[in-house]
Amino acid sequence: NIIIRFRVYNEGFGLRYEFPQQKSLNYFIIKEEHTQFAMTGDHTAWWLPGDYDTQEQETQETKLSEIRARFKKAVNWDNSSVSVFSETGVQTALQMKTADGLYINIHEAACEDYATMHLNLDDKNFVFESWLTPDATGLKGCMQTPCHTPWRTVKVSDDARDMLSTSLTLNLNEPCKIE
């Protein structure tokens, strides 16, 4: 059994996959995750090249359809370690703006004991798919039920400043345990 849990807020939503305790599933390995985010058009995007080893890249501004053409030039190949996975792969948080002026942000929250998420773009259909960072052996995660994935978050607003002021990501993380 798997539960797909959604939490919806005024400024967006989060979703995650939950695996309850069950007789037929105790330990399992995550090979891939195929969460998809379908865009409505060729939006302007502010993005970093998808790289397993570093986030020390410069932010790029292009249309979604232009990511592939810009990708090789966008990567800082002088970093001591570079591990890109696709010519249309980007890091989260990914910020976009539609032709109508709507801002969209895709990210994650409560990422604990699970691989971090990048996004791989199908640049013909403008669909992003989650792309998890593997460990040294190529696995994306070793899980034991009951367990869950991080939240996959989508924030929307007609004002880019709202992306910084929203509490959506904070609300999806566990409360601080430090007293």
Question: Where in this protein do the model-derived segments appear?
Answer:
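N-terminal accessory beta-strand-rich subdomains and adjacent acidic, glycine-rich linkers
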Residues: 1-178
